[in-house]
């Protein structure tokens, strides 16, 4: 499958080249932070990303919410940026693994869309079409993922890691919890703003920061830069010094994006807003994360088909999440959209997706394990 279309030859890029891929989630803006952070630590990140579909978001859409950012570049320009800056994120061209689209059409009519081996080959054929030296896979598990159970996620991770290693790529999978939205935002501009603030300050939502450091340290360790703990310490240092934010600014500039939006995130248009209020008092015991993803889709933040247009301002601020206490009438979420007529359906979906109870339930750890 990897040989069915264009191969992406990265041999002109000097140094260890590593890619990071997520199987999809809600609020998953890790690539926006991990890619420049890993580059600031010394590895080359040549990342080819996809668009969002259904309730999950895509890195390409998020980057395109930065005015001017070009996600389609000639490969030689892509290589030049990686050599000069250390990181570049582009979109996948139509002729990379074209047979995958044909195979997916067959899966769609043969009830094999959920087949783990076929999911694994679809993902890994695209990764193997590029000449990276290492691959870090973020395999999400839970209500906001396509992998609803730990067993399914672990099996998928094992298949993909085995494929990568057999092809001569250093490959590791990080199993992550998606039983609540990742971070405090869902949607394109909203997630970019949250990622920028983390890059600027080294501070943010604790689960998002923990996962960013886990993924980055896995990338550095694959590159032979030390064990996980020493690599994590290096990543923390590069966040605190602002070097990772500078890498992000340099990358956006080379992609012709407007860097002034990164320096002053108030320039992002975030639509009109509506607060969603807690219907009763208690602890947030559970969130149907897919429901939150669909609620953001209803606001215009995603697409049902690849031809749909996206409202970059649309999305949800997650004000309260699992394990937090609310009083009746407290704000639990803030909806964003350019079209206020979309609020009613989205608000209803958010309220349907949240359970409030009397007992404090601790959320799952965000990192569930590793497969190597």
Where are these regions (language model features)?
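Active-site cofactor/substrate anionic-group-binding motifs, chiefly glycine-
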Residues: 1-49, 53
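Well-ordered secondary-structure scaffolds
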Residues: 8-9, 17, 112-115, 119, ...
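Acidic, glycine-rich active-site loops and adjacent beta-strand->loop/helix elements
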Residues: 22-24, 51-55, 66, 141-143, ...
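Short glycine/serine/threonine-rich phosphate/pyrophosphate-binding segments
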Residues: 26-34, 39-40, 47-48, 55-57, ...
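General beta-strand structural signal in soluble alpha/beta enzymes
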Residues: 45-49, 71-74, 89-92, 136-139, ...
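Glycine-rich tight-turn/loop motif centered on a GG-T
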Residues: 62-72, 106-113, 146-150
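A glycine-rich helix N-cap at a beta->alpha junction
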Residues: 62-88, 158-164, 168
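Phosphate/diphosphate-binding glycine-rich loops and adjacent basic-rich segments that engage nucleotide
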Residues: 83-132
């Amino acid at each position: 499958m990897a040989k069915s279309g264009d191969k992406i030859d990265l041999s002109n890029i000097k140094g260890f080249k590593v890619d990071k891929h997520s199987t999809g989630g809600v609020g998953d803006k890790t690539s926006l932070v991990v890619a420049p952070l890993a580059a600031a630590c010394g590895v080359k990140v040549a990342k080819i990303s996809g668009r969002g579909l259904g309730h999950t978001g895509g890195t390409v859409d998020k980057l395109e919410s930065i005015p001017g950012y070009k996600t389609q570049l000639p490969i030689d320009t892509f290589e030049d940026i990686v050599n000069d800056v250390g990181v570049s994120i582009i979109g996948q061209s139509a002729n990379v693994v074209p047979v995958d689209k044909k195979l997916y059409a067959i899966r769609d009519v043969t009830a094999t869309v959920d087949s783990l081996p076929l999911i694994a080959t679809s993902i890994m054929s695209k990764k193997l079409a590029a000449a990276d030296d290492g691959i870090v896979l973020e395999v999400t598990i839970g209500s906001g993922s396509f992998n609803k159970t730990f067993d399914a996620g672990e099996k998928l991770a094992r298949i993909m890691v085995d494929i990568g290693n057999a092809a001569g790529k250093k490959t590791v999978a990080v199993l992550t919890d998606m039983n609540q939205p990742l971070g405090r935002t869902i949607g394109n501009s909203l997630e970019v703003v949250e990622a920028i603030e983390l890059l600027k300050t080294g501070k943010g939502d604790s689960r998002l920061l923990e996962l960013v450091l886990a993924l980055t340290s896995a990338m550095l360790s694959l590159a032979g830069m030390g064990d996980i703990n020493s690599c994590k310490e290096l990543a923390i240092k590069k966040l605190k010094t602002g070097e990772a934010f500078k890498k992000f600014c340099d990358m956006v500039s080379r992609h012709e994006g407007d860097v002034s939006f990164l320096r002053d995130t108030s320039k992002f248009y975030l639509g009109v807003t509506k607060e969603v209020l807690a219907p009763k008092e208690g602890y947030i015991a559970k969130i149907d994360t897919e429901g939150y993803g669909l609620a953001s889709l209803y606001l215009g933040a995603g697409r049902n088909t690849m031809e749909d247009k996206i409202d970059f301002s649309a999305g949800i601020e997650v004000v309260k999440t699992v394990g937090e206490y609310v009083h009746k009438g407290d704000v639990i979420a803030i909806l964003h959209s350019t079209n206020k007529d979309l609020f009613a359906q989205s608000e209803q979906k958010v309220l349907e997706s949240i359970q409030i109870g009397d007992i404090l339930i601790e959320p799952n750890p965000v990192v569930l394990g590793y497969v190597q």
